[in-house]
C-alpha cells in the first residue's frame, strides 16, 4: 500500500498531515509534482518529479498506483481513474470519492466547465478551513484502519 499525492495542487497544511501520518503508519508516501518539493527526511516519504505539462503528474500517478493504494487529489478525473484501478481516492477537504459518487462528481465538473466556457463566472472553492483539515485527517485515519483490517 502506498499513498500517492497530486502534490502540485495539494495544500501545504494537508502535506504536513500526510508527513506525520506516513511516519505513524509506516506507510510509503509519494508526492508527485512537476517542481522540486521540500519534504522532511524520512524513509517513508519520497518525491517523484515529472516533466511540466498538462496532466503529466496525474498520468504518472495513474500509471503507478495499484489496488489498495490511496490517491490524494482534488482532480476529479484523476480520482476516477484511480478508483477504476482499485485505489481509494480522497480530496484535501476530506471527501472520499467512491465508485458510487465519482460519476456524479464528473458530471458536475463537466457542467461547471461548460458554464465557464460560456463566460459565466462560477468562482473557485472556499479556502481550506479547520473543519476541512479535521475531516481530511479523520478520513485518512478511517482509510488506514480499513486497509489494516483488509490486510488481515
UniProtKB/Swiss-Prot annotation:
> What family name appears in the similarity comment?
Belongs to the UPF0178 family.
Which InterPro entries does the protein's record reference?
A: UPF0178
PANTHER family attached here? UPF0178 PROTEIN YAII (PTHR35146:SF1)
Per the record, the domain of life is: Bacteria
What gene name is listed for this protein? yaiI
Q: What is the lineage of its organism?
A: Bacteria, Pseudomonadati, Pseudomonadota, Gammaproteobacteria, Enterobacterales
Q: What is this protein called?
A: UPF0178 protein YaiI
Give the species this sequence originates from: Escherichia coli O127:H6 (strain E2348/69 / EPEC)
Amino acid at each position: 500500500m502506498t499513498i500517492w499525492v497530486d502534490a502540485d495542487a495539494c495544500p501545504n497544511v494537508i502535506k504536513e498531515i500526510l508527513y506525520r501520518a506516513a511516519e505513524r503508519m509506516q506507510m510509503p508516501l509519494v508526492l508527485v509534482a512537476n517542481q522540486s518539493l521540500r519534504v522532511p527526511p524520512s524513509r517513508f516519504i519520497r518525491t517523484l518529479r515529472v516533466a511540466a505539462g498538462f496532466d503529466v503528474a496525474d498520468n504518472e500517478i495513474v500509471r503507478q498506483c495499484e489496488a489498495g493504494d490511496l490517491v490524494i487529489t482534488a482532480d476529479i478525473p484523476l480520482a476516477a481513474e484511480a478508483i477504476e484501478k482499485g485505489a481509494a481516492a480522497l480530496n484535501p477537504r476530506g471527501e472520499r470519492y467512491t465508485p458510487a459518487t465519482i460519476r456524479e462528481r464528473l458530471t458536475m465538473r463537466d457542467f461547471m466547465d461548460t458554464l465557464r466556457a460560456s463566460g459565466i463566472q462560477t468562482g473557485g472553492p472556499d479556502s481550506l478551513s479547520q473543519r476541512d483539515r479535521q475531516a481530511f485527517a479523520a478520513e485518512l485515519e478511517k482509510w488506514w484502519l480499513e486497509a489494516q483490517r483488509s490486510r488481515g
